[in-house]
Regions:
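Solvent-exposed loop and beta-edge segments used for protein-protein assembly and interaction
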Residues: 26-28, 56-60, 95-97, 136
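Short, low-complexity, polar/charged sequence segments that are solvent-exposed and flexible
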Residues: 22-26, 53-55, 83-87, 122
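Oligomerization/assembly interface segments of phage tail-like spikes and tubes
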Residues: 1-13, 58-71, 140
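Short acidic, glycine-rich loop/turn motifs
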Residues: 7, 36-40, 115-117, 146
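Intrinsically disordered, low-complexity segments enriched in serine, threonine, and glycine
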Residues: 71-159
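Short beta-strand and beta-hairpin "edge-sheet" elements
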Residues: 29-72
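Short N-terminal edge-element motif at the start of the domain
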Residues: 10-42
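Short, surface-exposed beta-strand/loop "edge" segments at domain boundaries and coil↔beta transitions
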Residues: 11-14, 40-45, 110-114, 149-152
């Protein structure tokens, strides 16, 4: 996905090339997080290229193109925390992009975690990333048995 931007500046022409050079050094070829004014809750990740500049009627315009990943990501990770005493079914609702959550457990004993029936783990206190616990778009149910606190954190992405 390509995003194109045009930035206008009103500086004297003898300062414009210096300004253009500063912008080019700051952006050109760099992979950056890009937050659009029209979509402030998300960011895009892309490599930016400062393509050219024009000067019309003492208004300088600098053109920037960014080749971005197809998904826009929420600014903050989604976090679901649950205190478990017995058996709890926890629903993790995810956007379009598949994600593997970071799991943090605080428990005196282990917690039994079941995802999609055939993925079962017994985990004690600590932080984990389980590749088989991949969240799909929509509601994802995880069954947790034991006593303790479990937290799921992941980066959501949408088109």
């Amino acid at each position: 996905m390509t995003h194109k931007f045009a930035f206008n500046t009103i500086v004297p022409w003898n300062d414009f090339l210096s300004q253009y050079s500063k912008v080019k050094n700051a952006l050109h070829g760099k992979k950056l997080r890009i937050i659009l004014d029209d979509d402030p809750g998300f960011y895009y990740v892309g490599r930016c290229y400062v393509s050219n500049f024009t000067n019309e009627k003492n208004i300088g315009t600098i053109s920037v193109e960014c080749e971005c990943e197809p998904y826009k990501c929420k600014l903050a990770k989604t976090v679901v925390t649950k205190a478990v005493a017995g058996t709890e079914v926890i629903t993790l609702t995810n956007s379009r992009k598949r994600a593997v959550p970071e799991i943090t457990i605080t428990a005196d004993t282990s917690l039994n975690i079941v995802y999609q029936t055939y993925n079962v783990w017994d985990l004690g206190s600590g932080s984990y990333t389980l590749p088989d616990l991949e969240l799909l778009e929509g509601a994802n149910e995880v069954t947790v048995t034991g006593t303790g606190t479990i937290s799921f954190a992941w980066q959501e992405g949408a088109l």
